[in-house]
Amino acid sequence: MKYFFMGISFMVIVWAGTFALMI
């Protein structure tokens, strides 16, 4: 479960960074 949460957090950070670059 811990690794699953870490994976979700990592994906959210990557998505946020990509979204910020697109703006």
UniProtKB/Swiss-Prot annotation:
Gene: ypdK
Domain of life where this protein originates: Bacteria
The species this protein was found in: Escherichia coli (strain K12)
InterPro entries associated with the record: YpdK
Keywords annotated in UniProt: Cell inner membrane, Cell membrane, Membrane, Stress response, Transmembrane, Transmembrane helix
Bilayer topology annotation: Single-pass membrane protein
NCBIfam families linked: YpdK
Protein name: Uncharacterized membrane protein YpdK
Location of the protein in the cell: Cell inner membrane
Induction statement: In exponential phase, strongly repressed by thiol oxidant diamide (at protein level).
Chain segments annotated as transmembrane: 3-23
Main location: membrane
GO-annotated cellular components: membrane; plasma membrane
